[in-house]
């Protein structure tokens, strides 16, 4: 008897837990709070009387209402075929006319739409199925948009090609202007008239005379610096129409300081030595007598100075954690 009672109690507990699990119905979107054993009836009839919300069912044409009432399934199918043929014919028309027709068709369909929703107990007949799918058939001229898309792409490509051609022409014109400007500033131009009405050839002769006088002056010079200046001006090359007029640094007699000499001795008073002393400005206190924050400059400096003198294999990894 005792064993029978024990078995019955175990079976009763199992049934109770199973029924609780059946009523609980944990869903995937439920949180962990809903996992507690609670008696919550789910109102299955109220929630699952129908699986989808009521769909709005629009008639495709005005005659579809009469066909549905009369039960002529063949007539509705014939109307669908006629619509397909008419859509194919309309796809062959021009894009401008199609846009106007689309607007008119949408207005007419919206005006003829009725807010009739079929009852849920109605039988699912073929005309009812076509009637339910009428909402998907409202955008009739989808093919028109597809036919217009390649035309728009072609026009965009033509515009891009025209823009590229214009940019290339502008670049060529700028290059020609730059070449003309360079030729105008150089002394080798023989076609440009001078300011006093003299020809470009006269200007070239004057430039040659000036160069000869410069070479004579360079030969008469005594010091090495002056010789360098004359040679520098004589051998100055016209780079992009501009003449180099800056003489070399040896012309002024300036000597660069020796390379290996320490600069701190020479320029000791000119520069302020910073970085060696610690500034208290970096420490930010919440209160006047409070402790500094964790992100102070001192903390970063200590961490960096610890790593600064050692390589990665120069210290044991444990010492760093023990010293913290």
UniProtKB/Swiss-Prot annotation:
Keyword list, A-Z: Biomineralization, Cell adhesion, Glycoprotein, Phosphoprotein, Secreted, Sialic acid, Signal, Sulfation
GO terms classed as biological process: bone mineralization; cell adhesion; cellular response to growth factor stimulus; extracellular matrix organization; positive regulation of cell adhesion
Organism this protein belongs to: Mus musculus (Mouse)
Amino acid composition bias (Polar residues), ranges on this chain: 106-130, 253-263
Self-association and partners: Monomer. Interacts with integrins; the interaction promotes cell adhesion.
Entry superkingdom: Eukaryota
The protein, known as: Integrin-binding sialoprotein
A GO MF label: small molecule binding
Miscellaneous section: It is possible that the segments of clustered carboxyl groups mediate the strong binding to hydroxyapatite.
Biased composition, class Acidic residues, residue ranges: 66-105, 155-179, 203-213
Locations listed in the record: Secreted
Phosphoserine: residues bearing it: 31, 67, 75-76, 95, 155
Chief location category: secreted
Sulfotyrosine: modified positions: 320-321
């Amino acid at each position: 008897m005792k064993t029978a009672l024990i078995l019955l109690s175990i079976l009763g507990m199992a049934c109770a837990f199973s029924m609780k699990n059946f009523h609980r119905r944990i869903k995937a979107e439920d949180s962990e709070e809903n996992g507690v054993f609670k008696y919550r009836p789910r109102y299955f009839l109220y929630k699952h009387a129908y699986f989808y919300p009521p769909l709005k069912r629009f008639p495709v044409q005005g005659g579809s209402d009469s066909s549905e009432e009369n039960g002529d399934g063949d007539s509705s199918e014939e109307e669908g075929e006629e619509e397909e043929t008419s859509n194919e014919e309309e796809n062959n028309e021009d894009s401008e006319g199609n846009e106007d027709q689309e607007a008119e068709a949408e207005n007419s369909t919206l005006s003829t739409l009725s807010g009739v929703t079929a009852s849920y107990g109605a039988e699912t007949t073929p005309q009812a199925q076509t009637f339910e799918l009428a909402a998907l058939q409202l955008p009739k001229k989808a093919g028109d948009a597809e036919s217009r898309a390649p035309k728009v792409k072609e026009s965009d490509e033509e515009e891009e090609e025209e823009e590229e051609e214009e940019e290339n022409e502008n670049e060529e014109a700028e290059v020609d202007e730059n070449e003309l400007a360079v030729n105008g500033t150089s002394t080798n131009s023989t076609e440009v008239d001078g300011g006093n009405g003299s020809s470009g050839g006269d200007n070239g002769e004057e430039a040659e005379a000036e160069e000869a006088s410069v070479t004579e002056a360079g030969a008469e010079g005594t010091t090495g610096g002056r010789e360098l200046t004359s040679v520098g001006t004589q051998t100055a090359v016209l780079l992009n129409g501009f003449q180099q007029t800056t003489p070399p640094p040896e012309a002024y007699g300036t000597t660069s300081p020796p390379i290996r000499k320490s600069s701190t001795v020479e320029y000791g008073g000119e520069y302020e030595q910073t970085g060696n002393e610690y500034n208290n400005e970096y420490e930010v206190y919440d209160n006047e007598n409070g402790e500094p924050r964790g992100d102070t400059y001192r903390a970063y400096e200590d961490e960096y100075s610890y790593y600064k003198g050692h390589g990665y294999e120069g210290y044991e990894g444990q010492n760093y954690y023990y010293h913290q």
